[in-house]
Amino acid sequence: MNPGQFDSLNADVAGDNIFLYGSGRFTLKAGEARRFSIALLVGDSYDDLTLNAKTARQIYDTNYQFAKPPEKPALTAVPGDEQVTLFWDDIAETSWDPISEEYDFEGYVIYRSTDPSFLDQQNITDINGSRFLFEPLTTITGGWAKWDLINEYEGPSDIPYTGRGISYHLGNNTGLVHSFIDSNNVINGQRYFYAISSYDHGTKIMGIGPSESSKTITLNPETNEIFLDINTASVVPRSPAAGYVKGSVSYYDSLSFIKHISGFGTGTFSIEVLDPRAIEDTNTFQITFKDKPTRYSIEDLSPIVETRVSKKNVFITLQKNRLNADRFILKNGGSTMIMGQDYLLFPEAGQVVVTDTLNSQIADGDEITIEYTYYPLWESSRLNNEESNAVFDGIKIYANDKKLSLDKEKTQWSDGSSGNYQITVGPYDGKQSNMRPADYEIRWFDSIADTSSLGTATAPFQIWDVTPGKIPFKKKIVVLDYKVRNQTWDLGESVVILEEGAGINVSWQFDIQEPINDILNDAVEGDVFYVATDRPFNNEDIYQFQMMASSIQSEKNEGLLDDIRVVPNPYVVTNILEPLDRQNPRDRGPRRIYFDKLPNECTIRIYTITGELVKTIYHNTTFDNGQEFWDLTTKDNFPIAFGIYIYHIDAGKMGEKIGRLAIIK
């Protein structure tokens, strides 16, 4: 290659030479190395090209030290009927920018396209008219699928792009989410490409504008194989199979899906199913708590069994981490080995090792069997219905803790009671420290039922601790005989619960008065006034819930097959669902239609109106997929002629379906 000559290789070697680069003269001594940089510049226009060149030069001049966007979140896409469910992790939210030296994450934005390069979404132009920014997905309500932190950053950034005259939109202080259901003009059978990009707010002091993580999907035009980045997805929406029953949480009774094994917390849980495909049948999960601060973990109680070959001083890394050491079993030749003697376990890392310092019965080359359970959710502190818990087994859990307080809604006279005293409940002296996490019953009698633990005043009632999960027991009371002072409780006087312990240890106070704006009805024997409290979770609380996997109603049911259809029908020349020819973009891609709402297992036979078999298609897929494409070719792979065709669906026990379809070319 000669200096100043850029259009010749100056070589006789033939080859597919796409790019030619040249350089001025420079010396290169024996053994010496010179580094060089190459910038490949493209642009929509000359202005766009020169601006890109300036940016490339700036990057070079700063030794490639430029603003780093947040980490890419991991995206999962779940196809549905005219919708797509997306969910992602929160790794981007702890991204550190080495230039600004701060955690500058700001939000998430979703892009959708039928083109893997997303070029049809690069619609936002700069002042030069060049397409520069990508337009976010529009939600069904008309807004952008864009969510950002609630902080001082919102709207257009204060730092415009150099030479572009436009700024990145930082969002509208919506708050963050980690899942989204796209149902805005989602067409079954159409392949969509999604990307979730994380972005930061930039640094005004340094003049660095917002940065957005890349979105890269590579498609091999010869094989149509798709290569996805971690924050992208390719999905085809579809109807579920006929008879499909979506996976869900099991209910222990008609009211609750969760079972309170132990403890006395009154907080609540809810479960959102995001990916029914990932739910395992009859899988039981256990929720446990730790205190100071309150946090909870969820254990998958279905044991995982792995077989490995032992080698001393070599760590065995299991499929899962954050193991429950109490349920960990390691067997060698059918004998259970002892932790700490035969092997060492590192539960949080999910690793086990046999070291030569142990007096172990496990020798090199022994085949060992390992059984364990693990925590898919570990020490979450999200206790206010936050939606940012990680998704596991296709579900996300929401927890709502309660502060210790009186539950005024449930504190009332029990059904069947005739008394209507107005009873005001609160901690003694109004001190929060005198509240206790318990439920009580004030049980009335027609005669003396209890005596004050301080003094000798009597009362025609008893106070019992009836907290769910405890054996009910009677509490000690102190009658505040200050109104009549006749050594007995009188209407208008108060009662205080005396707790166990050294000294005078009091808790709740009950002020019992005549009813306001009502005729007095005295309490009689058998009347009960119930006192309920809201109680926070603590380390005594254990809950369990169980999931049911998706299933198929496989018994014969004529109605299940009635909804089977062909899309489009009639087929007229083309179909918007047909893919492009990636090798020859100007040519049309392969023709296609699809059968919809099929059983997950069935045989499709297509005939001419004279009864000649055209094609047999065997449909065997997952429960959530009732879709099967046909490329409008015969069994010999020839294009079919236009006309009317008969299709027959054989679904075995579920029955049969016959229909017609029209092809107009």
Enumerate the predicted regions with their spans.
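Glycine-centered tight-turn motifs at strand-turn-strand junctions
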Residues: 610-640, 651-655
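C-terminal tail/sorting-segment detector
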Residues: 642-665
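Extracellular fibronectin type III
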Residues: 201-249
